[in-house]
Amino acid sequence: MPSDFISLLSADLDLESPKSLYSRESVYDLLPKELQLPPSRETSVASMSQTSGGEAGSPPPAVVAADASSAPSSSSMGGACSSFTTSSSPTIYSTSVTDSKAMQVESCSSAVGVSNRGVSEKQLTSNTVQQHPSTPKRHTVLYISPPPEDLLDNSRMSCQDEGCGLESEQSCSMWMEDSPSNFSNMSTSSYNDNTEVPRKSRKRNPKQRPGVKRRDCEESNMDIFDADSAKAPHYVLSQLTTDNKGNSKAGNGTLENQKGTGVKKSPMLCGQYPVKSEGKELKIVVQPETQHRARYLTEGSRGSVKDRTQQGFPTVKLEGHNEPVVLQVFVGNDSGRVKPHGFYQACRVTGRNTTPCKEVDIEGTTVIEVGLDPSNNMTLAVDCVGILKLRNADVEARIGIAGSKKKSTRARLVFRVNIMRKDGSTLTLQTPSSPILCTQPAGVPEILKKSLHSCSVKGEEEVFLIGKNFLKGTKVIFQENVSDENSWKSEAEIDMELFHQNHLIVKVPPYHDQHITLPVSVGIYVVTNAGRSHDVQPFTYTPDPAAAGALNVNVKKEISSPARPCSFEEAMKAMKTTGCNLDKVNIIPNALMTPLIPSSMIKSEDVTPMEVTAEKRSSTIFKTTKSVGSTQQTLENISNIAGNGSFSSPSSSHLPSENEKQQQIQPKAYNPETLTTIQTQDISQPGTFPAVSASSQLPNSDALLQQATQFQTRETQSREILQSDGTVVNLSQLTEASQQQQQSPLQEQAQTLQQQISSNIFPSPNSVSQLQNTIQQLQAGSFTGSTASGSSGSVDLVQQVLEAQQQLSSVLFSAPDGNENVQEQLSADIFQQVSQIQSGVSPGMFSSTEPTVHTRPDNLLPGRAESVHPQSENTLSNQQQQQQQQQQVMESSAAMVMEMQQSICQAAAQIQSELFPSTASANGNLQQSPVYQQTSHMMSALSTNEDMQMQCELFSSPPAVSGNETSTTTTQQVATPGTTMFQTSSSGDGEETGTQAKQIQNSVFQTMVQMQHSGDNQPQVNLFSSTKSMMSVQNSGTQQQGNGLFQQGNEMMSLQSGNFLQQSSHSQAQLFHPQNPIADAQNLSQETQGSLFHSPNPIVHSQTSTTSSEQMQPPMFHSQSTIAVLQGSSVPQDQQSTNIFLSQSPMNNLQTNTVAQEAFFAAPNSISPLQSTSNSEQQAAFQQQAPISHIQTPMLSQEQAQPPQQGLFQPQVALGSLPPNPMPQSQQGTMFQSQHSIVAMQSNSPSQEQQQQQQQQQQQQQQQQQSILFSNQNTMATMASPKQPPPNMIFNPNQNPMANQEQQNQSIFHQQSNMAPMNQEQQPMQFQSQSTVSSLQNPGPTQSESSQTPLFHSSPQIQLVQGSPSSQEQQVTLFLSPASMSALQTSINQQDMQQSPLYSPQNNMPGIQGATSSPQPQATLFHNTAGGTMNQLQNSPGSSQQTSGMFLFGIQNNCSQLLTSGPATLPDQLMAISQPGQPQNEGQPPVTTLLSQQMPENSPLASSINTNQNIEKIDLLVSLQNQGNNLTGSF
């Protein structure tokens, strides 16, 4: 810019040689100066900006340039210089010092020069130079812009400016005309005047003159200041000084003279000087405060600037010098090169105790001078300096209008000393302080009072806030947790029309959660630019009264609505409508409807909000939280199903305590009051499961919880249940959400389907073929219907799973014909043993339940076993009839047991409720109803009708003990065994400690459990549910492999446990037990778990306690138990159970632990990967499984309950093999042979437990063997094949022979495969209708797979899970069903959030599997398992956890969708997925249908995340497990 350039030049010129400048300026005359005027002004502005820049250093060059430039430039330079000189104060100051010379020179040059000299004093020599030609210009300048630039500062420029363009001040010209001193005096005065007086009248006053004398110095300073221009209003200073010091004009004059000398001595204010030089240092010992409100000219003193403590004052010390000197203090700019401030001046503060000081004006800037004395150690606390805010007019005059536009409210105190050297020269030291904010701090806003303290969640009410400092830009914030930035907060709308500094009117924003049931307290605070109000006012959001009823209703609706979208009345009507169904088809209607009825009844009763809630829950449970209510209902159903082996079991379970139950059921359906009574009865008589389920099938879980807790507690527990249920509901509610949608259809369809199923299944039990047909119909039609309703999602999943399991059971029932005898024998033996064991165990498990349990196991199991044999012999219908009868007995026992359990497991019941709910949730009813029902159902189906009945008894009667047992026993074990289950976790953990593998497994398992717990931790109940679920899911998974395991996590378990467990799936109790055995194994010692899984416990106990004694049972149970044993073997039962659990969870965990993920993958994936990856642990886990299978195989071979055992084992190995014992036996023979080989490889221990243990150990040690063993099972796991050729035997059959050994080995695992292929064909249905069962059943019938399928039918879900190679989709499908389980597991494993999507878990699992060592095979397996979900769930017990929760939600919600959407495709996709590698992606799209969303997401992630996540998950699991241990302990 010209001005900048000129200012530089002018400053330089000035600095360099005032004389030459002067002569040039005189040469140039006014025009040039006027020309320069604008420049000078600009310069002043520029110089202001540049002054600092061009002050000291550039002067000579600038001068040259200035010389080179014309007079105008020099004159403007003068202005610039003046402004510049400010910046280059040193030079300029010297110039001003030179001013005397300059003045002399100027005076020599001319009067103008003289006056210029005065100007130069005022301004700079350069200004003078410029101005002495431009003296008139000064007039012009002053005249032109006296006010703006007449600040001599600028006016130094100004003066120059005056000379240059500020000459407007005639006075200046006058002064110029006058003697320079006069002029300087006058101009100085005029500056003062300007400040004090209107600019026009700024002409000289007497005052000014004295000021002027000072001004001479001051003016020179001013010139400098001008250079500084904006930042030090010298006017005010002058005025102040003149006013204040006007009296001492003489003194001022003296000062002037002194300053004349002093000026010569003291450098210009804009000069830059060192802090330290020649061994002398001026330093600030105490910095001034950071904020000091400057005083205005018109107000009184604001006091001196204090230090930051407000107790003292800024302190300065001069080091290296011991002679008295004068300390100068002025106000400088806030940053950059030091120069006087344009808006603030220093002012003297006087008081009684202040240090004496004097105020001088240098270059238009007020400078406070204080003496530094050696007596004070050359240290001074500066307590006499204040800060003065200049008037805008003074600012403009001082720095020009342009400069005055740049507001700066920060300033620094500048301390300077001039030390005389011996040679007469001056050493100047200068140091600036830290910046001081010179404005009043904005008041912090404050709320003093508000007109409203609470408001409904809808908000929109007006609140009047009275307070302080509500400034522009104020915001009123409502925040939930003020200490948490991430908590909910919302800005209230302010009525700006009524906005005031002291009051505001705002509208309350709506609360984010419109469905709160309790008042929520939030904070209100005000935020302004100055910050937020220090005080946070409390404000309360209350539940919406309108919505409150609705809310309660909503809760009820949410809970019951999921069961049935209809209103409660509608639900009641529907229930009543289905009342016939309830009575007629008590199976589902009671199961399904009863919960609704209880809810509606309870609602009708409105016994208590809690009951209503419980009711809701029961509805909800029914929905998915059905899990909770359904949990017991499911238990009921399960026991019923278990008892009947079909849904008729619910009726039979209602039948069992038909008096109570039918009454209860009917009362439930029809009698709210009775319901209350019934509920009470339920509480008192948990034994009456139907009652329980009737009274609260939500309460069933509640019943467990509530009954356990008792209705009194029930309210609390209802909430707890609601809470746990909520958890379950969270788990289940997602499920419920889907199931809610799905449940009306589900209930309707499920009821219809289940009625059909119960009608079909149960009628079909009349003829096995009918069952098969019905099952096929169900699969094809019903399941399609189920799928149709399944589109509803989880409900359908549940239904599908249930139906699939029912179909399985019917198929199993029908298929078992050949196998029935064997299975019957096995069942009889097993169940007898189980009964015995259960009797033995159940006492342990259910000490109070013992009689019931004994009765049940003895009566039910033996009776059942006996009746089962005849029944299986006679037919399913006989079996079912007997089962029903037994179930009735069982249910009565179960009711007793339940009561016992409830009493025993009140706490456990809560846990279990939660467990079950979460399991139910996880199973999404799939697991619970499906798991238990299906598990019992499936397991019984898996076992055979006999087994089923047996299992039903196991499950039914043990479910009363088993289903119940799982539920009750589980509950009790939750309490005791349940605790055991969780203790299984816990114990398992404890026992785990026994063996690291065990620990790992247990920890993994528990971690899984706990992860599940954590994942499902929402309620630990869920945890437990989850754990239980896990156990259940995993165990149940195991069950549900047979059952719904595949449905969810169980699939994984299915694969792992499932195969084995499912192999022993006919001994589904065993399966269940294996779960429990796993749990049992974990809690194995805790024989309660035996009770828990009475059959399995016996198995576990048998295996653990009597490995061989219960060989028949062991075979069955060994299959499971073997798993348990195997798992529990090395570290006996904990490991066993852990392993079993590990099979899914622990094994996964083992896998997780070892290869964490692989284990996970391997677990379901097949154990192989587990083996391969975490061979030792996995192997342990899988070995346990494999050993279980092997053990089972050996058991089969050893026990040679091989036909039965094979049936059993095959059920496990080839779940389908049970029904197709003949073929499957060969197949199984192959399977088992390979497995046997594996077993043999592993080591055939006479005692399965030993084998298991050995195998576990061996597996752990002999990973290969295990791999082989597992491979055999892992045959299931394609991993085995990739991993090991021997496993490939089985495995290859899995992969390649999928058709071959798939049928045989795969029969076990690959039956899935075959089933997968077949299932692929049928799997669409299977998938759709949980076709797994269907497919399994259908394929089973279709091929030897029919036997295999029966196997898989037995554990079709296993097939699904295991049908991984070809029908991983199936697995997915089942898995989906298991999804619930998986969901549980997932939620359990939810911590392993790596698979967020349910299905993505599947993909993840595959991905994870892919990530793992034999991931692809595993992936395949898992893909098989499509259940990757499951795998993931299980695989990533850690990772699954996330999945788990997600799974629950996802699967249950997505379950039917998954099943539905992926019917045909899923199997293929699953199969594709099951095919390691690529298929995953292929399969994913269809799987995507079910799994795709999650799968695609997860599979990439899964693989990448797989290993690390698994490891992390393992760690998580371990930590979780530890937590779980604590939890279990606490539970």
UniProtKB/Swiss-Prot annotation:
It is found in: Nucleus; Cytoplasm; Chromosome. Keywords: Acetylation, Activator, ADP-ribosylation, Chromosome, Cytoplasm, DNA damage, DNA-binding, Isopeptide bond, Nucleus, Phosphoprotein, Transcription, Transcription regulation, Ubl conjugation. InterPro entries: Ig-like_fold, Ig_E-set, IPT_dom, NFAT, NFAT5_RHD_DNA-bd, p53-like_TF_DNA-bd_sf, RHD_dimer, RHD_DNA_bind_dom. There is a cross-link at K556, K603 (Glycyl lysine isopeptide (Lys-Gly) (interchain with G-Cter in SUMO2)). GO terms for biological process: calcineurin-NFAT signaling cascade; cellular hyperosmotic response; cellular response to cytokine stimulus; DNA damage response; positive regulation of canonical NF-kappaB signal transduction; positive regulation of gene expression; positive regulation of leukocyte adhesion to vascular endothelial cell; positive regulation of transcription by RNA polymerase II. Transcription factor involved, among others, in the transcriptional regulation of osmoprotective and inflammatory genes. Binds the DNA consensus sequence 5'-[ACT][AG]TGGAAA[CAT]A[TA][ATC][CA][ATG][GT][GAC][CG][CT]-3'. Mediates the transcriptional response to hypertonicity. Positively regulates the transcription of LCN2 and S100A4 genes; optimal transactivation of these genes requires the presence of DDX5/DDX17. Also involved in the DNA damage response by preventing formation of R-loops; R-loops are composed of a DNA:RNA hybrid and the associated non-template single-stranded DNA. Its main location: nucleus. SMART domains: IPT (SM00429). One of its GO terms (molecular function) is DNA-binding transcription factor activity, RNA polymerase II-specific. The keyword Nucleotide-binding does not apply. Residues 200-212 have a biased composition (Basic residues). It comes from Homo sapiens. Residues 63-89, 179-192, 646-656, 879-888, 960-980, 1248-1266, 1320-1330, 1475-1486 have a biased composition (Low complexity). Residues 293-300 bind DNA. Homodimer when bound to DNA, completely encircles its DNA target. Interacts with CIDEC; this interaction is direct and retains NFAT5 in the cytoplasm. Does not bind with Fos and Jun transcription factors. Interacts with DDX5 and DDX17; this interaction leads to DDX5/DDX17 recruitment to LNC2 and S100A4 promoters and NFAT5-mediated DDX5/DDX17-enhanced transactivation. Widely expressed, with highest levels in skeletal muscle, brain, heart and peripheral blood leukocytes. Residues 264-443 form the RHD domain. Residues 34-89, 114-141, 175-220, 241-265, 640-666, 841-891, 958-996, 1211-1304, 1316-1371, 1473-1502 are annotated as: Disordered. One of its GO terms (cellular component) is chromatin. There is a cross-link at K556 (Glycyl lysine isopeptide (Lys-Gly) (interchain with G-Cter in SUMO1)). Signal peptide: none annotated. This is Nuclear factor of activated T-cells 5. The modification N6-acetyllysine is found at K122.
